[in-house]
Amino acid sequence: MDGSKFDDAQTGEQKIRNFNINFGPQHPAAHGVLRLVLELDGEIVERCDPHIGLLHRGTEKLMESRTYLQNLPYFDRLDYVAPMNQEHAWCLAIEKLTGVEVPRRAQLIRVLYSEIGRILNHLLNITTQAMDVGALTPPLWGFEEREKLMIFYERACGARLHAAYFRPGGVHQDLPDELLDDIDLWAMEFPKVMDDIDGLLTENRIFKQRNCDIGVVTEDDIQKYGFSGVMVRGSGLAWDLRRAQPYECYDEFDFQIPVGKNGDCYDRYLVRMEEMRQSLSIIRQAIAKLREATGDVLARGKLTPPKRGDMKTSMESLIHHFKLYTEGFHVPEGEVYAAVEAPKGEFGVYLVADGSNKPYRAKLRAPGFLHLQAMDYVAKGHQLADVAAIIGTMDIVFGEIDR
């Protein structure tokens, strides 16, 4: 037979090509506006191409034309699942450059609300990831608890989601004692809900089949792709900025860093469950310390507004208040990198200041961006149904990825 006519001799079986499908951007398991172009060989993922940018708002560029204080609310809109953790990094960067010492009471409040944010995030992640693999009950329980935490946000600053509560030099206002009592009471009752979720998922045969040995990440991959947070700890590395590079007063707190062993979706789930228990312990310690720590919650100076009582009696205070909210404070020239252990990983701010009242450049390091980069590598060879499980444990939220 002539070689050029070989095509005719191929059977239908031999002519099968790989099949391309779009996963998202309006898919319920896509966690926001993620679009994955998947190349499938039957049910097996051969290639996974993430398309991002559908929620891009140009945050980093917008920040260059706003004062430092006006930029703070942008951080609530990055990872909108746990907003205060992002504000924290911005405040730390400004405080590093200006050399401001945050009062102890403000540091404790920041730690308290950062840990509440961590539980907010993990509750949403664990329960919705369970829903992605077929368990419909946990999200209902998780949202019930998140509602209570949202009310604690609201009682601290007036907003449920976009808080703008952390300020350079401290926090906006002090917490009433009743709020601390209520958070303490909630922290005593919450373990029961965790035990319920634990009982429903941890030893559940179907949940384990859908998560064990899926999306395995090795120590080598972590170094190559720049992972952080639970993606690192799920593979057995005890890397946590709260321990490795303590900020605020985390070095005073007694807590463990949970680590996994296999680096798969199931281990990442277990790490998040244990992290919530550790956060509860930190919350209770912070409340105990707050009952003893008295004093102001803002470092009074050029960065922060004067007390209302002073403004009514002192002309200088009134002028300072007016200048602060019209022109804003000036940050000395320099560059700094400040990072916090956000619920999703290392959230960092690289800030370049030129001595004016606006940042010259602010680069935001979103942990989810680096995790999503590895999606092709992690998903290759898995089945189509496993893609949802992998995205879920990567903890993708598009506000911070697209910025």
From Swiss-Prot:
EC top class, in one word? translocase
Which PANTHER family does the entry link to?
NADH DEHYDROGENASE [UBIQUINONE] IRON-SULFUR PROTEIN 2, MITOCHONDRIAL (PTHR11993:SF10), NADH-UBIQUINONE OXIDOREDUCTASE 49 KDA SUBUNIT (PTHR11993)
What this protein catalyses is: a quinone + NADH + 5 H(+)(in) = a quinol + NAD(+) + 4 H(+)(out)
In what way does this protein cross or attach to the membrane?
Peripheral membrane protein
The protein's name: NADH-quinone oxidoreductase subunit D
Q: Which GO terms describe its molecular function?
A: NAD binding; NADH:ubiquinone reductase (non-electrogenic) activity; quinone binding
Where does this protein reside within or beyond the cell?
A: Cell inner membrane
Q: Name one GO cellular component term.
A: plasma membrane
The domain of life for this entry's organism is Bacteria
The protein's matches in PROSITE patterns, at most eight in alphabetical order, are given as: COMPLEX1_49K
Signal peptide location: none
